[in-house]
Amino acid sequence: MEPLYQYAWLIPVLPLLGAMVIGIGLISLNKFTNKLRQLNAVFVLSLIGTSMALSFGLLWSQIQGHEAFTYTLEWAAAGDFHLQMGYTVDHLSALMSVIVTTVALLVMIYTDGYMAHDPGYVRFYAYLSIFSSSMLGLVFSPNLVQVYIFWELVGMCSYLLIGFWYDRKAAADACQKAFVTNRVGDFGLLLGMLGLYWATGSFEFDLMGDRLMDLVSTGQISSLLAIVFAVLVFLGPVAKSAQFPLHVWLPDAMEGPTPISALIHAATMVAAGVFLVARMYPVFEPIPEAMNVIAWTGATTAFLGATIALTQNDIKKGLAYSTMSQLGYMVMAMGIGGYTAGLFHLMTHAYFKAMLFLGSGSVIHGMEEVVGHNAVLAQDMRLMGGLRKYMPITATTFLIGTLAICGIPPFAGFWSKDEILGLAFEANPVLWFIGWATAGMTAFYMFRMYFLTFEGEFRGTDQQLQEKLLTAAGQAPEEGHHGSKPHESPLTMTFPLMALAVPSVLIGLLGVPWGNRFEAFVFSPNEAAEAAEHGFELTEFLIMGGNSVGIALIGITIASLMYLQQRIDPARLAEKFPVLYQLSLNKWYFDDIYNNVFVMGTRRLARQILEVDYRVVDGAVNLTGIATLLSGEGLKYIENGRVQFYALIVFGAVLGFVIFFSVA
């Protein structure tokens, strides 16, 4: 064991320390702490930077072939129950810690420019720090109980960050929606976790899987019960990774500041669901029915997210549905047995999607100079256009991210997405077709986003269009003088974009099919040997890769004809296919259905319960009080102090008892 492993616990603890110091400062010395803005930012950055350095050290050690290391202490004991808490360092935790810390560090650097004039600047850094700590704690957890603790902490931090601007109604509603939706999945995870412990007597990932299969094979528990436990556990990742049908919270979460969209919705929180599926693979893999549920859930989500993203006009919401779709690819990969492919896409997606979200924040930052600090105007792509000449760094990095997510070689997204599609074709051609069609839609809506934002003429000064958008959003037109041209963002915002562009281009080369170093690292030696037996077939690679690139190029061409060359009118297409257009624009009406069935239904039930509470429960309580009051008022006259009166009462009581028992 390397000495470095003994200090791995510092990786999640250091960001927690930063959050605690700033939090105590904000509570006890609020004004003074807020004045030290830059100092607090540097303090948090230095701590997350140290965690990143330690994470790279652990990753390098694992690459060199060191064995996994687990350190635990007995946290609680009751009879045969012993709960261990500690940390584990293996291939998966080392890889995830590097992803989380690198993206978190770059997001924190970016935040200094994006949130420079926000009065909650210091509080935001505290939230970022505790969120990073929670995610890292989840990554290093050695058992399911500890995962669940940090899982809930991640959810709490998400609530705080999405609702950071709590004085805005939309943000307050969005964080509540995210919190409640995730509670549904978390309750399923809790039930599944308890069910697995009841069956196997363990919270250890490997032990749970082995014991569960032994119990099923010996007939001690039914296979149906094992399926139920596995699906219940999967409900947690369904909510956290915004999978159908618990996906509705993710687009609303864009109400939070853009750096959070990059951190939560690209590299960390939404990836936590895929990470948990990977951790629980010993439980899921031997249960074909559970794997089918996982695969079809992922495929449905990928297709659903892509179809909704086709018509989005808000740049951040378009990226949100894109994230939902890409997470669907990862989950589908896990369900068809593509453990390595799913993790590979998680890694590549984390970097290029973080860059895309930060790029959208840079665009919004520039647009606010022209249209003001109104999200309706600053985030609407219909008011953008021609930004490439004003914001060349942002445009170039956004184009790199767009090419990566579209799966154009040699960018990172091509290698990971192509591997998933290849495995899907072997497992189930229907799943492959869904993934293939989704790839075409991805290319279309991402280049639609790029062309609307960065190409053509700048539309931000069109007052009539501004008034039209504000009226549609139910807001009154604003008056005020703004600039006439957007500007490039400061270095603190463009540097993270340029840094993320490097892995967005190059990191996919770790997983090329003729020398898959990523697969060799993530797999155990036996699994790597099995994978090597299949070898690399050039013809198969060219056919599968050609298909995925071909559909992407078709999507790009259609987007170019519609939004760059204006040869196809999108409005006429919308009129020609109104049902499909409205279905996409209204997000398949999921929000409306959930609102009418669950929200309004719950409110109606609550009103009925209120009536019962008011008339029955309160009535019984009030009646008891009134009866007590009246009896007290009546009995107080008995206490008059005269002995002969007390004797008369006793005589009457005795006489009454005699008569009663005589009759009886």
Swiss-Prot record:
Q: How does it sit in the membrane?
A: Multi-pass membrane protein
Q: Which Pfam families match?
A: Proton_antipo_C, Proton_antipo_M, Proton_antipo_N
The EC number(s) this enzyme carries: 7.1.1.-
UniProt catalytic activity: a plastoquinone + NADH + (n+1) H(+)(in) = a plastoquinol + NAD(+) + n H(+)(out); a plastoquinone + NADPH + (n+1) H(+)(in) = a plastoquinol + NADP(+) + n H(+)(out)
Top-level taxon in the UniProt lineage: Bacteria
GO BP: any one term: electron transport coupled proton transport
A single GO molecular function term of this UniProt record: quinone binding
| Membrane-traversing stretches | 7-27, 39-59, 91-111, 120-140, 144-164, 187-207, 219-239, 258-278, 290-310, 327-347, 352-372, 395-415, 420-440, 495-515, 541-561, 643-663
Q: Which UniProt keywords apply?
A: Cell membrane, Membrane, NAD, NADP, Plastoquinone, Quinone, Translocase, Transmembrane, Transmembrane helix
Q: Where in the cell is it found?
A: Cell membrane
Question: Is the keyword Membrane in the record?
Answer: yes
What does this protein do, in the record's words? Answer: NDH-1 shuttles electrons from NAD(P)H, via FMN and iron-sulfur (Fe-S) centers, to quinones in the respiratory chain. The immediate electron acceptor for the enzyme in this species is believed to be plastoquinone. Couples the redox reaction to proton translocation (for every two electrons transferred, four hydrogen ions are translocated across the cytoplasmic membrane), and thus conserves the redox energy in a proton gradient.
Family the UniProt entry places it in? Belongs to the complex I subunit 5 family.
From the Swiss-Prot or TrEMBL record, give the protein name: NAD(P)H-quinone oxidoreductase chain 5
Q: Which gene encodes it?
A: ndhF
